[in-house]
Amino acid sequence: MPTVVVMDVSLSMTRPVSVEGSEEYQRKHLAAHGLTMLFEHMATNYKLEFTALVVFSSLWELMVPFTRDYNTLQEALSNMDDYDKTCLESALVGVCNIVQQEWGGAIPCQVVLVTDGCLGIGRGSLRHSLATHNQRGESNRFPLPFPFPSKLYIMCMANLEELQSTDSLDCLERLIDLNNGEGQIFTIDGPLCLKNVQSMFGKLIDLAYTPFHAVLKCGHLTADVQVFPRPEPFVIDEEIDPIPKVINTDLEIVGFIDIADISSPPVLSRHLVLPIALNKEGDEVGTGITDDNEDENSANQIAGKIPNFCVLLHGSLKVEGMVAIVQLGPEWHGMLYSQADSKKKSNLMMSLFEPGPEPLPWLGKMVQLGPISDAKENPYGEDDNKSPFPLQPKNKRSYAQNVTVWIKPSGLQTDVQKILRNARKLPEKTQTFYKELNRLRKAALAFGFLDLLKGVADMLERECTLLPDTAHPDAAFQLTHAAQQLKLASTGTSEYAGYDHNITPLQTDFSGSSAERI
């Protein structure tokens, strides 16, 4: 996921730090040292990450737009000027703007805020922003929570004792709370020095920027792979005591299925699957950035000569038009597939399904899927002209039924008019009349629209009084009976008000023959 590094360049960051030796350091130098360490790590282990650099004091400035060139980011660190007072709110507004312009509101993003814990003074300070948080309108809302999925990591160029001597730590913790609790505050353990700054940024790297390495297995074939971006733990909301589910480092392929059968399923996240080549000594090659082009070319040549199952799988899925179902954990599956990046380039991707025994209803339970050879006859037909999917559900789903929709008044009016039209054609339309009447009755009970039942009952009684002398005698009996049944249902308390109860035609001497047909 993209990263925005937000660097504090206010005057408070120029405060000197007493470090052993003759060279004098400022807090901004310690911050730049820590960020250099972070950028070097990402250049080696997280080089697909897009990163932007923002500096701020009372205003904010985008120093480096989203890039994968970490040399540019490191150069920008040495070219930062010093400005005036701290205004964290303006920096957070800037982060919102640049992320939404580049990635929209759906892509998760990590924000690394580097500051010394000084909150600013007067209007625009973090204290003032938090104090007026509940008094704002929609036009000038506080930028947290971010309008996109995010994690906010605050790197403080101060130790815990210094922050606790004021209310700085409480205010910074409030920022994490406002971001829905997504994020963490890091402080320097012990005195301010380069070693302790490295230790603090090392904790951030371990938490958020450690590459996810796994072993992809299919039978006796295996391949070491990196999954990018790193899969996040998934929490099932329905559980009473939810425990985050983490995918296994052993990704075992359990089967293959046609792309047409799996279609475009709902997924939690999508990830690149990159092969990690190993030389004879067991060291990784081809995954990092080397300083010398010749060394890099020779490493790539070595990696290209070693057979790799990941490459074989990618090519096979692309040619055969299939996807591989992969086991991520207990009752948790995903799929591996080839996705075209351009006309000539494609990538091996992995999508994660929701945990559960039946993540895709049209495939049924994953444990019940098996090879074609186990079937008595080929489920795809001899000419590959049919498919066993989608499985037909035992119970009709709600969207497969003729549901009653009364979003607009015209829908309700149409249903009532249909009943009245059939009422005027009784007894010939007895079956249709009661079918439409019961449909309206069930919908009214489901919506709690009991007044509608009484209103339709009054209409039917009125229709009964307007029957011509030439009308069949059975029509009056049926209308009166239907009106009485609706009035009983409109009370909501009688046995006739049950949802599953149906109004049946009244048995009369005139309707005997028609009742038998019904």
Curated annotation (Swiss-Prot):
It is found in: Nucleus. Mg(2+) binds at residues 10, 12, 86. The modification N6-acetyllysine is found at residue 418. GO terms for cellular component: INTAC complex; integrator complex. It holds the Pfam family VWA_2. Keywords: Acetylation, Magnesium, Metal-binding, Nucleus. SUPFAM superfamilies: vWA-like (SSF53300). The keyword Nucleotide-binding does not apply. Its main location: nucleus. GO terms for biological process: RNA polymerase II transcription initiation surveillance; snRNA 3'-end processing. Disulfide bonds: none annotated. Residues 2-204 form the VWFA domain. Belongs to the Integrator subunit 14 family. Component of the Integrator complex, composed of core subunits INTS1, INTS2, INTS3, INTS4, INTS5, INTS6, INTS7, INTS8, INTS9/RC74, INTS10, INTS11/CPSF3L, INTS12, INTS13, INTS14 and INTS15. The core complex associates with protein phosphatase 2A subunits PPP2CA and PPP2R1A, to form the Integrator-PP2A (INTAC) complex. INTS14 is part of the tail subcomplex, composed of INTS10, INTS13, INTS14 and INTS15. Component of the integrator complex, a multiprotein complex that terminates RNA polymerase II (Pol II) transcription in the promoter-proximal region of genes. This is Integrator complex subunit 14. It comes from Bos taurus (Bovine).
